[in-house]
Amino acid sequence: MIARILDGRTCAEKVKARVKENIRLLQEKGLPSPGLAVILVGNDPASATYVAHKERACQAVGIRSTVYRMPNTITESELASKIDECNRDSNTHGILLQLPLPAHIDPANLLERIRPDKDVDGFHPYNLGRLVQRRPALRPCTPYGVMTLLTETHENLEGKHAVIVGASNIVGRPMALELLLAKCTVTVCHRFTRDLAEHVKSAELLIVAIGKPGIIQSEWIKPGAIVIDVGFSRLSPNKIAGDIDFETAKERASWITPVPGGVGPMTVATLLENTLQAAQTFL
């Protein structure tokens, strides 16, 4: 068995085309384009690259993006003031606080300070609570991007055993909520999980989000499973790896995402979708 490839780039282009068309329709009605404020703290090269990619994606679909670049020495209270300013700005429909932040700043306090209706990353307790209550509003970008990508398989997910490896607030936990909404039976594995291999072997849908290349051995993968690799590690300037060895895993899976070109483009596309959704609540 050779897996079919879940191409995140192709799926993301479909999402972006829909967003672009909806923005065009807004403009035809004389309404302003959605506005996104991105707050970037410090000089982390990876964060700067991600933000530049988001800027280009916004420009391509017609979203106005403004990047506020803050020094690494900024205090938590100063950063909170910038968020408050964006909250008040009627031309800003979405706010994104680029993570990670410097060690002296608590991200939880600042993410909670963003207005829930401008929280296009979907991390505010209000938006996560809506997801828990099965009444989603703005949804976390990577998990919802994965759900959109899964529609490309045309597989019925109801009743499937989904195993998530990784329990972060950004991916693992909201991913479990999304899969419960899709009527999957969900197992979440984390650093204290015993017999990880046995859990993985039972997965009809496997989603791995750890950031450790090779943490999942290909022989653990159930033949015919759908495999989503959210992991992203830069091994060298020209080499990027996921959490699973793609070449061997594709011989067991029915569908598999590549790294890069799988989940990453969907995260950005979902951010654009969320920004449009946030703008539509104001316009």
UniProtKB/Swiss-Prot annotation:
It comes from the Bacteria. InterPro entries: Aminoacid_DH-like_N_sf, NAD(P)-bd_dom_sf, THF_DH/CycHdrlase, THF_DH/CycHdrlase_cat_dom, THF_DH/CycHdrlase_CS, THF_DH/CycHdrlase_NAD-bd_dom. Its EC number is 1.5.1.5, 3.5.4.9. Pathway: One-carbon metabolism; tetrahydrofolate interconversion. Keywords: Amino-acid biosynthesis, Histidine biosynthesis, Hydrolase, Methionine biosynthesis, Multifunctional enzyme, NADP, One-carbon metabolism, Oxidoreductase, Purine biosynthesis. It catalyses: (6R)-5,10-methylene-5,6,7,8-tetrahydrofolate + NADP(+) = (6R)-5,10-methenyltetrahydrofolate + NADPH; (6R)-5,10-methenyltetrahydrofolate + H2O = (6R)-10-formyltetrahydrofolate + H(+). CDD domains: NAD_bind_m-THF_DH_Cyclohyd (cd01080). GO terms for cellular component: cytosol. One of its GO terms (molecular function) is methenyltetrahydrofolate cyclohydrolase activity. Homodimer. Catalyzes the oxidation of 5,10-methylenetetrahydrofolate to 5,10-methenyltetrahydrofolate and then the hydrolysis of 5,10-methenyltetrahydrofolate to 10-formyltetrahydrofolate. This is Bifunctional protein FolD. It comes from Coxiella burnetii (strain RSA 493 / Nine Mile phase I).
